Amino acid sequence: MAREYVDDHRLFLYHGGSLVGDITDRVSGLTARDERNALSVELSFSVLKNRTDALAPDLKLAPGDKVRVINHALEVFSGVIVTAGLDGSVTAYDQGWYLNKSQIIFQASGVAAEDAVARLCAKAGIPLGGCVSLPTRIQKIWTGSELSAILSEILEICTAETGEEYVYRVASGKLWVNRQTREPVAAYHRPADNLSPFPITWALGEVSGSDSMEELCNRFVLTESNGDEAKVIGTAENPDSIARYGLVQRVESLGGDENTAQARQRLKNLLAKNDRLTRTREVSQIWGCDEVRSGVVLSFGSGTYGLSGLYRVDAVTHSYGKPHLMSLTLSELDSPRAAGTGDVVNV
């Protein structure tokens, strides 16, 4: 879509359900921040305010007003104003914001994860748009937890058992749960009507980043609780990684009624996923594309700047203007194991 036209993002204001109008020319610094570990997208901008200018009446933006960002009839953002400052600064969030605010009591008694997700949405009053098959059994009680925290934990349990990563997002007022894609998106930018679109990864801004062992874990212990007692079900470790980087251990608990084979597979998946160095890169001032959201994969080919291969977008900030620009935080999709694959699993 982005390759078909020159971006023209317009901001519309709604009050009490009624359209006030296009206020694009009255605002500056229109940006959207989208992060993988945040359920909602944040939109921020500043409104021109001059109490002495009769030709620039106060828009009187207030918490609860709705805003939409439209690009050539396509909705890019729809949300509610949460903060309106006296200085004209405004912050709005999409509907995912509500999932981080309301706390509920929820119990899953050995049900399939997809059923737990459906029941969770019904209890929280959030329509479920769609959910992939999640056969992992969930056995847990949450008291006074946000829906987003419960959902994240359920999907983490599923990932540990299946080895697949999952992502959830609020869109069109509904919650959607899907498998995390590994296919790169075709991200194009068209700077002018008389110029052809080009892949945004062809022209990079400033590139920075780091390689880190901060998130590395090379030994897992799986436990099972029974009343006041807990017992060890199994362990998984990489001796070579422990010898090189030191022991970093994490204790996990069974999420349901896993058998021995499932427990073994879960330990193997946990170790394979977490016994890795984290390679992150940050790119500032890259050409903008609406298809670039948190969680998507981009393909880079700039070995000179240490940015080559497939990278997942962990965070993106869109700066809507002339031109449309972005800043990206990326993580390597398939970072190598920390020190070989000589894993030892005991169940």
Residue ranges and their predicted role:
Residues 25, 66-93, 167, 299-329:
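Short beta-strand and beta-hairpin "edge-sheet" elements
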Residues 36-53, 87-96, 222, 277-286, ...:
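Oligomerization/assembly interface segments of phage tail-like spikes and tubes
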Residues 44-45, 81, 92, 105-129, ...:
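Amphipathic, non-transmembrane alpha-helical segments in extracytoplasmic/periplasmic proteins
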Residues 85-99, 132-211:
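Short beta-strand-centered interaction patches in the first periplasmic/extracellular domains
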